Amino acid sequence: MATPLFHADLTVHTQSHDYPIVITENAIAENSSMASQVAPYITGRQVLIVTNETVAPLYLKALQEELEAQFTVQVCVLPDGEQYKNQSSINQIYDVLMAVHFNRDVTLIALGGGVIGDMTGFAAASFMRGVNFIQIPTTLLSQVDSSVGGKTGINHPQGKNMIGAFWQPQMVLADMSTLKTLPARELSAGLAEVIKYALIMDAEFLTWLEHNLPAMMALDLAVLGEAVKRCCQYKADVVAQDERESGVRALLNFGHTFGHVIETHEGYGSWLHGEAVAAGMVQAAELSQKIGWLTSDEVACVKRILSLANLPITPPPIEVQTALDLMGHDKKVKHGQIRLILLKSLGEAVLTNDFDPHLLTDVLATHAP
């Protein structure tokens, strides 16, 4: 008896509009019903698919041919990598839109991972002051996190995601089958964001992950699908409460302030985003222990589960002052003070600046050259 394909439907509620998250299998395969799932969310007759040089050979043809039966379809294929998440790539998207005289009736489709999703969303938010877009995330990281919630943007040489907009998609279609073509390193990077949700919101989920990580890393799509569904539901609930990150949504950035320091310092693309977040979560846990919130056993638990996912648990050597300067560019800085997401306990996070700055310096010094 054949194993039934995984399928789940969720809804994200936002001030601008509600939209579905469809988590499924084999949606982008040739002769699939993908177009029937996406087409209802395409307004107008114009479609621009934005993808990259890695994803295009795998999935572009099937998607493009299906949509061409109903729409005028153009394609923009960008280089692959975090180092290309910049204004030059955004201009390439604009150039295609302008060259074919697409207008406000266009729908952009992001076919790729977090970088493609962030850039396509930002292009959609800014082209003609805003057009629709759809997310088709093809990496675990983008399926569980970046494709949901409307954060879009690009990097600046002095800081990650410094330029962007909140712009919600019309739908998110997460095809679990795309994870079969994901390199092991990219899968692990996505697991960092999955583990993040457990650490900040749900200690029971952390226990579930410890038990199920081997199956996830062996590409058991049913188990991966359950993890993606849980993470998307967590994020949808948070976005419904705080769409523009003025409060509780900031907790989703656990590990990211430290992680962005790593990415910016080492050069975009040197460390994958999930790898940097993993090391950053350990640093945040270490600071939480110094404050007196976590025990040494709990910090060891954080390190253990990240190691199980083949993720780094120590950052590269960075001078303390350099790290502090980079943290000063963080979007959570308020009135000149660095605010961090820390753990009160496993499964409970808080955004705070109520800590001795010397404790932060101590954590950074542990890994300084």
From Swiss-Prot:
Gene3D superfamilies: 3.40.50.1970, Dehydroquinate synthase-like - alpha domain
GO biological process, one term: aromatic amino acid family biosynthetic process
Any GO MF annotation of the entry: 3-dehydroquinate synthase activity
Superkingdom, natural source: Bacteria
Disulfide-bond pairs as recorded: none
Pathway: Metabolic intermediate biosynthesis; chorismate biosynthesis; chorismate from D-erythrose 4-phosphate and phosphoenolpyruvate: step 2/7
EC code(s) of this entry: 4.2.3.4
Compartments it resides in: Cytoplasm
CDD domains found in the cross-reference section: DHQS
Reaction(s) this enzyme catalyzes, per UniProt: 7-phospho-2-dehydro-3-deoxy-D-arabino-heptonate = 3-dehydroquinate + phosphate
UniProt keywords, alphabetically: Amino-acid biosynthesis, Aromatic amino acid biosynthesis, Cobalt, Cytoplasm, Lyase, Metal-binding, NAD, Nucleotide-binding, Zinc
Cofactor(s) recorded in Swiss-Prot or TrEMBL: Co(2+); Zn(2+); NAD(+)
Cofactor note: Binds 1 divalent metal cation per subunit. Can use either Co(2+) or Zn(2+).
Gene Ontology cellular component terms for the protein in this record: cytoplasm
UniProt binding sites for Zn(2+): 193, 256, 273
Binding positions (NAD(+)): 80-85, 114-118, 138-139, 151, 160, 178-181
Entry-linked Pfam families: DHQ_synthase, DHQS_C
NCBIfam families: aroB
Protein family (similarity comment): Belongs to the sugar phosphate cyclases superfamily. Dehydroquinate synthase family.
Biological role stated in the UniProt entry: Catalyzes the conversion of 3-deoxy-D-arabino-heptulosonate 7-phosphate (DAHP) to dehydroquinate (DHQ).
Name of the protein: 3-dehydroquinate synthase
Organism in which the protein naturally occurs: Psychrobacter cryohalolentis (strain ATCC BAA-1226 / DSM 17306 / VKM B-2378 / K5)
